[in-house]
A protein has these predicted regions:
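C-terminal membrane-solvent junction of multi-pass transporters and transport-like membrane proteins
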Residues: 327-409, 413
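Selective recognition of specific alpha-helical transmembrane segments in multi-pass small-molecule
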Residues: 6-11, 46-58, 124-140, 169-176, ...
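Membrane-interface loop-to-helix entry segments
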Residues: 63, 95-139, 198-202, 315-324
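Membrane-water interface regions at transmembrane-helix termini and the short interhelical loops
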Residues: 15-17, 33, 41, 99-122, ...
């Protein structure tokens, strides 16, 4: 958690500096790096692929948590349908998914101002409730001593390679926001505000989350009387459920769902809407773009990902292989090719002009992105090649390095 928070905050600061300095959103920032037409490639990757999948993943996770709430309020809820499934999803969870999806969409359609206000009160409220839950979990685990001495039993030995792989996947979860953090930092009053705010905010929140997680896991271990499956997708919900008190369990799960909903609305549906609007203004508005993310995010059957950890790991490797190179190319372009100086007239080029790149596409950036993606994902096709398998396991880090170095080698020729 600590390593992830440090890495993510550094990514936010470095990649958000251009937007903070010039007040431009991600859609415009990416035009400088990839060209006014070439920008559609990374923009679609960020706004659509990640937005679609994360909407589905977050909503199904929230739905599984909501199952516990409904079963506490309406005993027997989880037996609805008698084991019948709908597209591979149990009927009770399908109902919970529909409810969470509708709530998320309604919040999104309320508008960006409401989203901002919702996020501002949701985050503190969630943490207050989680801290209360932490104290109850510690008590349930038999005291602070038991929590501090708690050590999950790994299914395989912990190695350096395994540790880096874990950190890479954790960072991949936040790789999308690293890429389009400019949509947030563009509103900063100065370039120094993100430098101070992100590290403090990330470190405090992640360390608190780590403490809460360990406390809940220790509580679950104490209640279950031994080892627990830390790889189980619903492990955190099970840990909350182990507290026992129905009112507290319901309150904590609802708080967790509020936080998850705020994340998917602000961190995934909104970027999807913004990117679709920026690239296809005649076809989409910010609201309709977000709705597309919700619909497609459901049609991909996201519950198949959370039910199969292999699929989930594949997804994190995939997004790491995409976002790592994009972030690396953007950093190399801004700090070395541009020397932190952007030409806004070129970025906001009139329709029909090339914006400083032949045909409006920076093929060097696009080429580096493609090569980086192929290299980092090759390990999935050739798992027997140890080097490629390791590169794939460290997809975000390796993709970032390959994209950064690759663009330094072929792309950093300063334009007049």
């Amino acid at each position: 958690m600590l390593f992830r928070s440090v890495i993510v905050s550094i990514g936010y600061v470095l990649n958000g500096r251009a937007a903070a300095k010039y007040g431009i959103p991600f859609a415009m920032q990416i035009r400088d790096t990839f060209g006014v037409k070439g920008a559609i490639v990374p923009a679609m990757i960020r706004g659509l692929i990640a937005g679609f999948v994360f909407f589905g993943l977050t909503t199904i996770s929230s739905a599984q948590a909501l199952d516990i709430v409904f079963d506490r309020i309406f005993p027997g809820y989880l037996q609805l349908g008698g084991g019948t499934t709908l597209l591979g999803l149990a009927i009770p969870t399908a109902i919970s998914y529909l409810i969470m999806a509708v709530i998320t969409v309604v919040l999104y359609l309320a508008g960006q101002k409401f989203i901002d206000k919702f996020s501002n009160w949701a985050s503190p409220a969630v943490w207050v409730l989680m801290v209360i839950g932490l104290f109850l979990a510690v008590s349930n685990a038999g005291g602070l001593g038991n929590v501090l001495s708690y050590h999950p039993v790994p299914s395989t030995p912990v190695t350096v390679v395994g540790f880096i792989t874990c950190v890479s996947m954790l960072v991949s979860n936040w790789a999308g926001p690293i890429v389009n953090i400019g949509d947030l930092t563009r509103n900063a009053k100065s370039t120094s505000d993100p430098v101070r705010g992100f590290p403090i905010g990330m470190l405090v929140s992640y360390l608190l989350f780590a403490a809460v997680t360990i406390g809940f896991m220790a509580s679950l271990s104490a209640v279950s009387g031994g080892a627990i499956d830390v790889n189980k997708p619903t492990i955190f919900v099970d840990a909350i459920n182990s507290i026992g008190n129905p009112f507290v369990v319901i309150l904590l799960i609802l708080a967790m769902n509020v936080g998850a909903t705020a994340f998917v609305v602000f961190g995934n549906m909104l970027p999807s809407g913004l990117q679709l609007t920026a690239q296809f203004p005649k076809l989409f508005s910010v609201k309709t773009g977000g709705l597309v993310a919700a619909v497609v995010g459901t049609l991909i059957l996201p519950w198949q990902f959370v039910q199969n950890t292999t699929m989930l790991y594949l997804f994190y490797s995939f997004i790491g292989s995409m976002f790592g190179p994009i972030a690396g190319i953007m950093l190399a372009s801004y700090y070395f090719e541009r020397r932190q100086q952007l030409d806004l007239d070129t970025i906001y080029a009139e329709p029909g002009t090339d914006g400083g790149h032949p045909g409006g596409v920076n093929w060097r950036a696009v080429g580096v992105l493609i090569v980086s993606f192929v290299i980092t994902m090759a390990g999935k096709a050739l798992p027997g090649v140890a080097l490629l398998a390791t590169i794939n396991s460290w997809a975000f880090f390796c993709g970032l390095a390959i994209g950064f170095v690759g663009y330094l080698l072929v792309g950093t020729r300063r334009r007049a």
